[in-house]
Amino acid sequence: MIYDYIVIGAGAAGAVVASRLSEDKTKSILLLEAGPDYPDFERLPDELKFGYASGTDVMTSDHNWQFLGQPTPIAEPMLVPRGRVTGGSTAINGQIFLRGMPEDYDTWASLGNTEWSFDKLLPYFRKLETDLDFSDDFHGTEGPIQVRRYKEDEWVPITKAFKESVVSAGYPMSEDANNPDATGLSATPLNNTKGIRWSTSLGYLSESRDRLNLTIKADSVVQKIIFEGKKAV
């Protein structure tokens, strides 16, 4: 079969790109993923479904490429977890849904590409999320990825003690770390609700995988891309 678009990798970017492209019913899309795909949420392995998997659970999993990196010539090699499953690294990471500071994006824009300014990116931040805690101009309410923060009465004792020590030292509290004016201590925004990890597979592909113009082919390792000039053939 001939496809209009072939997307390699169903991770943080690929799952989104394929899902968005398939919104055009006149185009056919093939999404290739080296790792497995789990169309049925009920059969999703616990290490991917729930947000508690860490350490050995992830490091030794078949859903992780298990890359090794060496930060310096004399340092011991270290594991660099990267997802090998639909959802990519969003299926195995720490689920911290924290934006950068506006000044950082504006600095990028000042280097030549004005599309990277905070004001230009904000609509996409909002489109990405359904923030269950905030619904102001800086947060989305209809996006595919659900975001929440643990309320203070849900914090474990050590977290409460840390908060008390920080406040007693004179640092301010902030309700929302993703507010552009935020400073001080704040609960971390997470793409995890009720213990469920909202990866791009769950957030994006669950909405698009039944479209007739989108084919998801898992366990498919791409060896190379053949180009003619600047065109992939």
Sequence positions of predicted segments:
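N-terminal redox-cofactor-binding region of secreted/periplasmic oxidoreductases
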Residues: 1-233
